[in-house]
Amino acid sequence: MNKIRKGDEIIVITGRDKGKRGTISLRVDDSYVLVDGINLVKKHTKPNPLKGTTGGIVEKSMPIHQSNVAIFNAASGKADRVGIKLLADGKKTRVFKSSGEEIKAA
């Protein structure tokens, strides 16, 4: 079970974007996540008339390693850790470590 999933609100805990918040839009591989508006880089693109793209400098979000982000706990307003709790019916659920509150599915 992945502790961080698509749709989770996260906060960046290290790097040049430290403190910024966003929502995970895609999980890349097993250890990278793509967050809208975080880790922006400038890509220089060549014009391609076949694809209908113009050349220039484009800002693009790049993947960030999941160890550099933490799930955001809206109740406390801080970053939090994720724990796995086994329910009585045998299902697993994600909970915040600080409060034990269940994380709502996105």
Curated annotation (Swiss-Prot):
The keyword Cytoplasm does not apply. GO terms for biological process: translation. Keywords: Ribonucleoprotein, Ribosomal protein, RNA-binding, rRNA-binding. GO terms for molecular function: rRNA binding; structural constituent of ribosome. Part of the 50S ribosomal subunit. Belongs to the universal ribosomal protein uL24 family. This is Large ribosomal subunit protein uL24. The lineage of its organism: Bacteria, Pseudomonadati, Pseudomonadota, Betaproteobacteria, Burkholderiales.
